[in-house]
């Protein structure tokens, strides 16, 4: 019934005053809507003069600047025609080297805001200020403030104006010095101030420094059409044909009339299945049928225990390159800090695990040094573990001199340092010289800095029967020299095996005592044999006990003790059996 009354009322208003007024259909408000639109939709079309409350979506407002207002049905249709206008926020404006000159924070559709550039900067049009407009999709543009162009540096040329700074798009004319010309062969030229500075450098060139066409390369070419002439510092780029890879710089540069070294185009070989030492490809059995593969392919792999990839992980990617697989050594040995034993020193680094070819530093305690005489050193993780165990050894102190004096004033010496010394008058070293040198080694000095009186030297050591010295004999031996003796086989050395030179004479030499030779002939004469042995000939040293027993069918004719004979300097008393 209400709907019928609304229709009759609408027709009556439309025909009032004899004028036909067009009713308004339900308003489809872009970026907004009527309040209670589901209930109100039934009462449309509406007569002119009707008003309805409506709201706008987020980031949109009514023409009055509110988030809601009234929309009015007029004879020309709905008013306002655009109920919801887009808003733009001042906070969305990013301006470097400038600032917004207005105080408002929100702007509606088609509203303009002004911005100013800082001193020394200008808009893209060369002005100190500009404007942006709020459009349907936001601000028309982000404001830009760019720097002015200063007077450039001239090379073999001079400016034709006296200005010191230039606005965007300003032109600066310059002329070349006598004998020089611009890149186009002219003696004058111009540069333009752009957003990134001057269009080019105001440079003039000596024509003798120009280059001809760049050199050709096998399986490759330049990326641009070659010219007949190139100016100094011109650059030309090369590229390779398909299946070739560029090696070296892809650019050549003209300098002093010559081009720099051009690159090479290397054939890209395929890669065979990678046999990874101490590791494997993931899913290698599945992947193996797809090899060889082209350059640029990569595969994941893992390393065995105690091995890692070059990046320090247990897995990584191996890459096919024109030179083969990379990394060339996919799995590297690791070394542990705990495997290092260092006496009188300490490791100066905190890491506990090191990969192949990685160095670790160590330091020696005060008063100790490395084998090279330094306070610190390094060892390297190799395929079989650490390169060496670090060593810290003590310095050599000033030695005690005998009949001699040092030729330097130092008090301590590093490993491999040399100390020169000289003998007192009337004394000489072992080789007959009056000066000598000693070297600081790991166990101390190489020898004592001792000089001798020639009357205290000895000749060759005395010979002994059935024995000899263990070293080649010298003509002369210095005091306290020692020579070692040894006996022939089966002879027993009696006494000290060394003799010493003292006051020109050798100490008492040792003797070589004869062995006892037990023969089958002597045993047969006495009807005896060796106890527990089947030897027919036996050698015994002095002091050795030889046990005998009667042969089968014979009885002892001497005492029981005689069957345990003792060898005395080659003589033995045999027992007898009858």
UniProtKB/Swiss-Prot annotation:
The keyword Repeat applies. PROSITE patterns: SUSHI. InterPro entries: ComplSys_Reg/VirEntry_Med (IPR051503), Sushi/SCR/CCP_sf (IPR035976), Sushi_SCR_CCP_dom (IPR000436). It is found in: Secreted. Pfam families: Sushi (PF00084). Its main location: secreted. It comes from the Eukaryota. Disulfide bonds join 88-134, 117-145, 149-193, 176-204, 211-254, 240-265, 271-320, 303-331, 335-381, 364-392, 396-440, 423-451, 458-501, 487-512, 516-567, 550-577. Keywords: Disulfide bond, Glycoprotein, Repeat, Secreted, Signal, Sushi. Glycosylated. One of its GO terms (biological process) is complement activation. Residues 20-85, 86-147, 148-206, 209-267, 268-332, 333-394, 395-453, 456-514, 515-578 form the Sushi domain. PANTHER family: COMPLEMENT FACTOR H-RELATED, COMPLEMENT FACTOR H-RELATED PROTEIN 3-RELATED. Homodimer. Involved in complement regulation. Can associate with lipoproteins and may play a role in lipid metabolism. This is Complement factor H-related protein 4. It comes from Homo sapiens (Human). The gene is CFHR4.
